[in-house]
A protein has these predicted regions:
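Transmembrane beta-strands of outer-membrane beta-barrel proteins
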Residues: 1, 40-48, 87-95, 120-122, ...
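Repeated loop/turn-to-beta-strand initiation elements of outer-membrane beta-barrel proteins
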Residues: 34-44, 81-89, 130-137, 272-278, ...
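Transmembrane beta-strands of outer-membrane beta-barrel pores
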Residues: 3-9, 33, 48-58, 70, ...
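Residues that define the transmembrane beta-barrel architecture of outer-membrane proteins
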Residues: 17-27, 64-74, 114-124, 256-262, ...
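Outer-membrane beta-barrel "beta-signal"
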Residues: 119-137, 416-433
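Outer membrane beta-barrel transmembrane domains
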Residues: 242-254, 285-433
Length: 433
């Protein structure tokens, strides 16, 4: 929760000349849940955000400027897969809603408007295979190897021994505590007990405990995955955007999008070894969207747009130790929008659609290098290319981004070819103390 308040004024012996008040407050709540068993994989995510602000400025006791705003948003999503041996049925609903309202008074004018958004998707999957999180197994190997290197653990432990240690780590991480310090103390005590009871430890001293604490604190990230999963999906969705402007012409816009996709999705994740990870995904679907935009008194447009989408993304990660990583990625997304003729029986002049082709491709990397406790390097580089071609008869249209899970619309799309873009960032951190 964040709150801020600022008050300042300028005055003379004759009274206040100016006065400004500013107050803002925000509340953010986030919840996540992960479950993995032989029969059931589940992830839950929920977030709530509420905020507001008030800003006033007065001169000689008269209000010159006042701005007040209120915003809120709720996001809910769930990933569920129920397994029958290697086959599964999945249901992954999501819901997002937001509201923003503002009241602006300045120099004799009064401006009010509000914007609300709501979207939901309810995809259903049927597929084969599963992908598991394996960072606990990697952390078990980190702990054991670090203790062997410090001559505090016995060499020769088998892969089965390390898998049993990984299972213990998973159990400890799922224990719930209100106080994070008590949780960490409990985890280290239980881990120390397990290592001694199962013959891992030769000697326990300050070096042993410092190494164990370090690997427990920093050896659990980033997330690592392993497995293959293929699925066919059916994904209906609905999105509504509404804007009301109470100033001037008192405008009103209501945009509704009805979405439907069906296709296939392939995911592959492979930890090549302790240090290398490869992740590959492929998606192809056919979808149709309908966009109806209403003004206060009339229908402004009614677009019906079928389309085909194909996308491939590959990422390779290199993790030489617990504090350094390098990740390289590349992707290609292709989309084709196909014109659907207007219903000849319709008397609605606003019904239409469009033709177009789109290409998005890019490659890049990001990395974090830990030289020492005092010096760290963080950087990223990306190069991107895009090309869009629209039938000349359909230039001023609503268009969707081909690389999104839903259809993201923006207006005024025109032809664009051979557009290159790049992104580069580099930062060096040096700590004096």
């Amino acid at each position: 929760m964040n709150n801020s308040f600022n008050k300042n004024y300028y005055s003379t012996n004759e009274g206040d000349l100016s006065r400004r008040n500013y107050l803002s407050s925000a509340l953010d709540v986030y919840y996540s849940f992960f479950k993995n068993s032989v029969k059931w994989q589940q992830e839950l995510y929920a977030s709530l955000s509420i905020g507001g602000s008030n800003n006033e400025y007065r001169e000689f006791g008269q209000l010159d400027y006042a701005y007040r705003s209120l915003s809120s948003s709720i996001a809910l999503s769930s990933i569920n897969r129920y397994y029958f041996n290697e086959l599964f049925v999945g249901f992954n609903p999501s819901l997002n809603t937001s509201y923003f309202r503002r009241n602006d008074e300045s120099f004799g004018t009064h401006y009010k408007d509000y914007t609300s958004r709501f979207n939901t998707y309810v995809p259903v999957h049927v597929g084969y295979g599963r992908i598991e999180r394996v960072e606990d197994a990697r952390q078990a190997a980190y702990i054991y190897n670090a203790l062997v290197k410090k001559a505090r653990a016995k060499e020769g432990k088998s892969e089965e021994d390390l898998l049993m240690l990984a299972e213990k780590i998973s159990q400890l991480k799922n224990e719930r505590f209100f106080d994070a310090r008590n949780k960490k103390i409990y985890e280290l005590e239980e881990l120390d007990k397990y290592l001694k009871e199962n013959g891992f430890i030769d000697e326990d001293d300050i070096t042993y405990f410092a190494t164990l604490e370090d690997m427990w604190e920093y050896g659990n990230s980033p997330s690592r995955w392993s497995g293959f999963r293929a699925s066919a999906f059916f994904n209906p969705g609905y999105y509504i955007y509404e804007n009301v402007d109470r100033a001037g012409n008192d405008s009103y816009y209501n945009h509704k999008y009805y979405l439907l996709k069906t296709g296939v999705k392939l995911d592959y994740a492979k930890p090549i070894n302790m240090y290398w990870q490869n992740t590959l995904s492929f998606t192809s679907y056919y979808g149709i969207s309908r966009n109806r935009t209403n003004g206060r008194y009339q229908l402004r447009n009614d677009w019906r747009t079928p389309g085909i989408h194909i996308g491939v993304r590959d990422q390779i990660g290199f993790y030489p130790n617990t504090r350094t990583y390098l990740s390289a990625y590349s992707y290609v997304y292709l989309a084709k929008q196909m014109d659907k003729p207007k219903n000849e029986d319709s008397s609605d002049d606003y019904v239409g659609s469009f033709k177009g082709k789109s290409l998005r491709t890019g490659a890049g990397f990001s990395g974090y290098y830990y030289f020492s406790p005092q010096l760290r390097l963080n950087g990223s580089l990306g190069v991107f290319y895009s090309a869009d071609i629209v039938d000349p008869d359909y230039e001023n249209v609503e268009y969707y981004s081909p690389d999104s899970d839903g259809w993201n619309y923006y207006g005024g799309f025109t032809n664009s070819k051979n557009l290159f873009d790049y992104q580069f960032s580099l930062s060096i951190e040096y700590f004096l103390f």
